[in-house]
Every structure is written in C-alpha cells, then in structure tokens.
Amino acid sequence: LLVPLVTFHLILGMGTLDHGGALTERRSADATALKPEPVLLQKSDARSTDDNDKDRLTQMKRILKKRGNKARGEEEHSKYQECLREIRVNNVQQEC
C-alpha cells in the first residue's frame, strides 16, 4: 500500500516518470549542492615561518641535510628505545 502511494507522490511532485529527466536533474542538483567547495591555499599561506620570517620547511631540510645519516626517524628511534628497554628488563644481549 505504501509503495503505490510513494510512486504516485513522485509522479505528481517531481515531474513525470516517462521523461526521467526531471528526477535525474533534481537529484544531481541536490548532490552538487552538498559537495564541499575546495580550499585553495597560496604557497605563502600553506607554509609556516618562524619568528625571523624564515621558511620552517626549508630550515628543516637544511638541518637534516647537515645531520646526514645521523638523523633518525621517529619510528627508528622508538624501535631503538624499545630494544634498549627489553635488554634492561630481560638482561639479554640482542642485536638492535
């Protein structure tokens, strides 16, 4: 009983079903209205600067380049710390 009532409402409310275009256009317009607009960032807005107005990303690249192989990533550092804890707890020599 509910299905014929809904179908009848769609036919009268949104246009005829024989064309099909009215329903499709309305749905696509609704979907377009729900899409968020893209945020456009300029390069100056996307990058942060320190107190001396120097680009932090460029400074970090220079620091890492100077350190060379001595620089450790966060994952490598945490793995190293975990290995040291296991050695202390288990009093076992392990290859880190």
From Swiss-Prot:
InterPro entries per UniProt: Conantokin_CS (IPR005918)
Source superkingdom: Eukaryota
Binding-site positions, a divalent metal cation: E82, E86
Signal sequence extent: 1-24
GO cellular component term, pick one: extracellular region
Keyword Calcium set for record: yes
Basic and acidic residues bias locations: 44-57
An annotated Gene Ontology molecular function: ion channel regulator activity
Keyword Glycoprotein: no
Localization annotation: Secreted
Positions carrying 4-carboxyglutamate: E75, E76, E82, E86, E95
Pfam families assigned to the protein according to its UniProt record, in alphabetical order: Toxin_36
Annotated segments matching region Disordered: 28-57
Keywords: Calcium, Disulfide bond, Gamma-carboxyglutamic acid, Ion channel impairing toxin, Ionotropic glutamate receptor inhibitor, Magnesium, Metal-binding, Neurotoxin, Postsynaptic neurotoxin, Secreted, Signal, Toxin
Tissue spec: Expressed by the venom duct.
Propeptide residue interval(s): 25-72
Annotated S-S bridges: C83-C96
Further information: Adopts an alpha-helical conformation in presence and in absence of divalent cations. Calcium facilitates disulfide bond formation of the synthetic peptide.
Family, similarity comment: Belongs to the conotoxin B superfamily.
Domain remarks in the Swiss-Prot or TrEMBL record: The cysteine framework is C-C.
Role according to the record: Conantokins inhibit N-methyl-D-aspartate (NMDA) receptors. This toxin has the highest potency for the NR2B/GRIN2B subunit, followed by NR2A/GRIN2A, NR2C/GRIN2C, and NR2D/GRIN2D subunits.
Name of the protein in question: Conantokin-E
Source organism of the structure: Conus ermineus (Agate cone)
